From Swiss-Prot:
PANTHER family: TRANSCRIPTIONAL REGULATORY PROTEIN YEBC-RELATED, TRANSLATIONAL ACTIVATOR OF CYTOCHROME C OXIDASE 1. One of its GO terms (cellular component) is cytosol. Belongs to the TACO1 family. It comes from Nitrobacter hamburgensis (strain DSM 10229 / NCIMB 13809 / X14). Residues 1-21 are annotated as: Disordered. Pfam families: TACO1_YebC_N (PF20772), Transcrip_reg (PF01709). This is Probable transcriptional regulatory protein Nham_3525. GO terms for biological process: regulation of DNA-templated transcription. It is found in: Cytoplasm. One of its GO terms (molecular function) is DNA binding. It comes from the Bacteria.
Length: 248
């Protein structure tokens, strides 16, 4: 799990720093609406919708907001969103993947390209960096849900590929094909997880100096602040001192 804690810290910067709850709720609602529109409005029968609702509850999104986002999917005036993936290289040649839900792909591409150019990076073609990441499912539980041994035993029995336990909680990784079944099995034993999601996990991470790291973290913050960008993944490590300095 090289660079694991750094990967987690960088991915969670947005969750800790985003003071604009309305923007965060808007992104969560957009994912809920898209998930409900593509499948069924019943989360018991729609794994993507269920995962989106879990993410919303983890951020204390009001129940009314969640229900309204689901209902919006069946309305005649429901907005149509394109699901896109952008890939590129940031400062220091660090690989970055962005998952986007947008109602204007030209605007999204233009904005993201501008962010990369201004940061000294460049936006590439789809597939230009994703080969350096694994597409995995992750299920997360708080540390007090189970001991590390009990979680490991249950996860392996459910078909998980890897388990990382620590003070911050339990992270269970499984293949894209099996992680929904793994999540369901663990929920039957430990209750609802705090997170169930498909992610892009870097196969390896590269250490960068503080100057490059600061540029990268600023770029990631810019991307996360964009209304259309749902998730950002990158394959770098920075010093704990820099993370602390920037509030990571």
């Amino acid at each position: 799990m090289a660079g694991h804690s750094q990967f987690k810290n960088i991915m969670h910067r947005k969750g800790r720093q985003d003071a604009q709850k309305s923007k965060l709720f808007s992104k969560l609602a957009r994912e809920i609406t898209v998930a409900a529109k593509l499948g069924t409005p019943d989360p018991a029968m729609n794994a993507r919708l269920r995962a989106a609702m879990i993410a919303a509850r983890a951020e204390n999104m009001p129940k009314d907001n969640i229900e309204r986002a689901i209902k919006k999917a069946s309305g005649h005036d429901a907005e149509s969103y394109d699901e896109l993936r952008y890939e590129g290289y940031g400062p220091g040649g660090v690989a970055i993947i962005m998952e986007v839900l947008t109602d204007n792909r030209n605007r999204a591409a233009s904005d993201i390209r501008s962010y990369f150019t201004k940061s000294g990076g460049n936006l590439g073609e789809t597939g230009s960096v994703s080969f350096m990441f694994d597409r995995l499912g992750v299920v997360e539980y708080d540390a007090d849900k189970a001991s590390a041994d009990d979680m490991l035993e249950a996860a392996v029995e459910a078909g998980a590929d890897d388990v990382v336990s620590g003070e911050g909680g339990h992270e269970i990784y499984a293949s894209q094909e099996t992680f929904r079944d793994v999540a369901r099995a663990l929920e039957g034993k430990f209750g609802e997880a705090r997170k169930v999601a498909l992610i892009w996990k870097p196969q390896n991470t590269v250490a960068v100096d503080d100057n490059t790291g600061e540029k990268l973290l600023k770029l990631i913050d810019l991307l996360n602040e964009h209304d259309d960008v749902q998730n950002v993944y990158a394959n770098f490590e920075v010093s704990d001192a820099l993370m602390a300095k920037l509030g990571g």
